[in-house]
């Protein structure tokens, strides 16, 4: 939200809220947050590291953490609960743009579009063979809001659909969309495209590792738009180098920004993006508003008039 916060200053002023706007490149580290300890009552944050140590020194003044977006794995929820800090997020925030990013990656790999573009610009005239999505099986790991949206869209392309989740998925959705729920090993062994759409928690940390990658078919492509640590990155690099899978599309990484020396940067069969699959000004605007709403609720301020308050016009 930082690039747009000035647009919403009139709304914060309406509620007599003073703003502290730190300089942030990607996220605030534990040490950087400690510098603001005791100086704020609430925060709208991204993936800033609200550890137990940070929360302990920020309370009792800190009352609410409003996460801009969905994932709250960077917040120590147990410590927040113990210290009386409410935590809010914006579920279903970026379902559509993330789902469309997954479909874009699948189409790019299936139709070999980036590789033909590179060849043409290098002066070559090479007809690289492609496949259609209707020939392929998609396996979605994490059939939540984003996972469901990916499956619905993939169904329109005639793909065979597999799902895996640790919670039971409504039978109506599965029947309506022709999704077969199965075990993770079976999904990995059968899928041509594997889309990771699960949240990061103790059950999903390094879910994709050397052992699970050994189950993947050599022609498969791994797509991760969820959280970087869901994948054991060194194990993925090794698997790609060994030809255990044919490619990967990665929007998230174990360390962000991705280090310049990462082997992933030089792999021709890997597509990379800087944690940007949520990119959509339309959906950003909804998340801005909902993040402010969660902040106000945590500060026990009235929200009835929030929707009537206007931010400054968005630059064209």
Description of each model-found segment:
Residues 39-117, 131:
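Phosphate/diphosphate ligand-binding glycine-rich loop within oxidoreductases
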Residues 83, 90-137, 149-152, 156, ...:
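Phosphate-binding beta-alpha-beta segment of Rossmann-like dinucleotide-binding domains, i.e.
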Residues 35-42, 59-62, 189-194, 217-220:
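Short acidic/histidine-rich motifs immediately flanking catalytic phosphotransfer sites
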């Amino acid at each position: 939200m930082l690039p747009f916060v000035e647009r919403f200053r009139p709304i914060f002023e309406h509620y007599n809220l003073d703003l502290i706007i730190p300089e942030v490149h990607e996220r605030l580290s534990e040490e950087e947050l400690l510098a603001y300890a005791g100086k704020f009552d609430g925060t709208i944050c991204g993936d800033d590291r609200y550890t137990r140590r940070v929360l302990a020194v920020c309370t009792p003044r800190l009352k609410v953490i409003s996460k801009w977006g969905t994932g709250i794995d960077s917040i120590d929820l147990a410590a927040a609960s113990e210290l009386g800090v409410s935590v809010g997020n914006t579920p279903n925030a970026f379902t559509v743009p993330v789902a469309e990013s997954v479909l874009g990656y699948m189409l790019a790999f299936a139709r070999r579009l980036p590789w033909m573009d590179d060849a043409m610009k290098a002066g070559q005239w090479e007809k690289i063979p492609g496949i259609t999505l209707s020939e392929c099986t998609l396996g979605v790991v994490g059939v939540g809001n984003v996972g469901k949206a990916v499956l619905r869209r993939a169904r329109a392309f005639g793909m065979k659909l597999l799902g895996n989740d640790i919670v039971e998925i409504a039978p109506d959705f599965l029947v309506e969309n022709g999704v077969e729920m199965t075990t993770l090993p079976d999904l990995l062994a059968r899928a041509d495209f594997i889309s990771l759409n699960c949240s990061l928690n103790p059950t999903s940390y390094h879910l994709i590792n050397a052992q699970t990658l050994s189950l993947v078919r050599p022609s498969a492509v791994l797509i991760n738009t969820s959280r970087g640590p869901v994948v054991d990155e060194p194990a993925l690099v090794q698997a790609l180098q060994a030809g255990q899978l044919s490619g990967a599309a990665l929007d998230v990484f174990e360390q962000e920004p991705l280090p310049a020396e990462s082997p992933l940067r030089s792999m021709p069969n890997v597509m990379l993006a800087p944690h940007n699959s949520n990119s959509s000004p339309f959906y950003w605007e909804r998340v801005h508003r909902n993040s402010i709403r969660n902040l106000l609720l945590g500060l026990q301020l009235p929200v009835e008039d929030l929707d009537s308050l206007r931010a400054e016009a968005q630059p064209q």
